[in-house]
Amino acid sequence: MDIEWQISSGLVEYEVAVNAMVSRVDKIVQGSEREMVWLLEHPPVYTAGTSANSSDLLIDNLFPVIKTTRGGKYSYHGPGQRVVYVMLDLKRRNRCDIRAYVRDLGVWIVNTLAEFAIDSYFSSENIGVWVQNDMHSEKIAAFGIRLRRWVTYHGVAINISTDLTHYSGIVPCGILGSGVTSLRALGKEVTFEQFDSALKKEFYKVFA
């Protein structure tokens, strides 16, 4: 597959990234650009997906709050989190099935985490990748997806070394009582370079 992988250094403002992503998606739809997987980090921000409830925003002045076009509810992005924007043309794969695509994303992230001896699972009910921790589950990767003419955009956010206290201003993904975790919180000190390498390796096992 002729897919471009882009890794941005430093922190990329959320709205700047979304505008660039939408522009790229338009070109993929038109057939003038290759598909892309974009790996980046954002400065601290809360994003409100298309089904966000205002009651899930607990502290409205902690970080900027931005409405976004992805599916889902409130989420947090910030330093130490690997954001993965996936721009794939599902028509080219004869896979015009959004549920199957989301499941494939789940398999990809679960397999990537397994590279670092993390046992996780994808939930189709509470969309995302979770880790069972003692008596409850904690989310380690959040999903938010949108399609334009069967080209995917937005994607996945995986907590590597994220400051988990930054989630205190929201009900993450609208799921009361659920926790969040990170590779660091699970005792895994992993660099972005190491994680990105595993992501790329496992990607081609799922998205042939």
Swiss-Prot record:
Against NCBIfam families, the record matches this protein to: lipB, PRK14341.1, PRK14345.1
Annotated compartments: Cytoplasm
Q: Which CDD domains match?
A: LipB (cd16444)
Gene Ontology cellular component annotations, sorted alphabetically: cytoplasm
Q: What else is known?
A: In the reaction, the free carboxyl group of octanoic acid is attached via an amide linkage to the epsilon-amino group of a specific lysine residue of lipoyl domains of lipoate-dependent enzymes.
Described function? Catalyzes the transfer of endogenously produced octanoic acid from octanoyl-acyl-carrier-protein onto the lipoyl domains of lipoate-dependent enzymes. Lipoyl-ACP can also act as a substrate although octanoyl-ACP is likely to be the physiological substrate.
Q: What positions does the entry give for substrate binding? A: 70-77, 142-144, 155-157
Where would I find the BPL/LPL catalytic domain in this sequence? Answer: 31-208
Name under which the protein is recorded: Octanoyltransferase
The highest taxon in the source lineage is: Bacteria
What is the active site of this protein?
A: 173 (acyl-thioester intermediate)
In the UniProt record, the gene name given for this protein reads lipB
- Gene Ontology biological-process entries: protein modification process
Reaction catalysed by this chain?
octanoyl-[ACP] + L-lysyl-[protein] = N(6)-octanoyl-L-lysyl-[protein] + holo-[ACP] + H(+)
Q: According to its UniProt record, which protein family does this protein belong to?
A: Belongs to the LipB family.
EC number(s) per UniProt? 2.3.1.181
Q: Where is this site: Lowers pKa of active site Cys?
A: 139
